[in-house]
């Protein structure tokens, strides 16, 4: 998109993706869309989108919507308690403390990642498994940071709300569709 802006003389224009969220469809599929926005699928779409956008020329990625509405996948409309989508924003916010981004070498279908390193050389990474097909099979993934270490693993899925599930030096994971892990070096 940035190349098109430059090509047509808009090189000083901000590149903004505005009012995005999960949408399966606007007619018969709309009730399904709203159900998913409030659950794990919406959260993983949000996290995967952030991972992808980080590698683009976007200047801003504007989620729709955190106001009390049907498109708010971050907070419950009535209680204001966090929904699954909250953890996508919470985890992404941790990357503001990183000194540099580390780009993934391999791209795997339906697997999205974001990785950074802080001023002490400690790694923080997110890996998501998203597909619009709810019946997609699990994926086994391995992460190699090029160094050994001990890592805290946090899980966001249907049963877990971004909580610590293990501390390990083995970075191989069997990921269900619509799940995400946060890997934090100790």
Regions found by a protein language model. Name each.
Residues 161-167:
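Short beta-strand and strand-turn-strand segments in soluble, beta-rich domains
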Residues 167-186:
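C-terminal beta-strand-rich structural cap/linker in extracellular carbohydrate-active enzymes
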Residues 107-147, 178:
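Carbohydrate-binding surface patches
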Residues 144-160:
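Solvent-exposed beta-hairpin/edge-strand motifs
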Residues 6-11:
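Short helix-capping segments at alpha-helix termini
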Residues 17-113, 119:
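Aromatic/acidic polysaccharide-binding cleft in carbohydrate-active enzymes
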């Amino acid at each position: 998109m940035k190349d098109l802006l430059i090509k047509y003389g808009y090189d000083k224009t901000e590149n903004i993706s505005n009012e995005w969220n999960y949408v399966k469809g606007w007619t018969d599929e709309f009730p399904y869309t709203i159900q998913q926005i409030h659950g794990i699928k919406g959260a993983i779409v949000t996290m995967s989108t952030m991972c992808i956008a980080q590698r683009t020329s976007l200047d801003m990625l504007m989620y729709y919507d955190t106001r009390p509405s049907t498109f708010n996948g971050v907070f419950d409309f009535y209680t204001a308690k966090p929904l699954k989508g909250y953890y996508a924003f919470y985890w992404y916010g941790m990357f503001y403390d990183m000194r540099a981004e580390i780009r993934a070498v391999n791209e795997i279908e339906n697997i999205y990642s974001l990785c950074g390193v802080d001023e002490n050389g400690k790694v923080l990474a997110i890996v998501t498994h998203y597909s619009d097909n709810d019946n997609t099979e699990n994926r086994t993934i391995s992460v190699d940071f090029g160094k050994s270490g001990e890592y805290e693993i946090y899980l966001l899925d249907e049963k877990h709300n971004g909580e610590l599930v293990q501390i390990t030096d083995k970075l191989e994971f069997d990921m269900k569709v619509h799940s995400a892990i946060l890997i934090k070096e100790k």
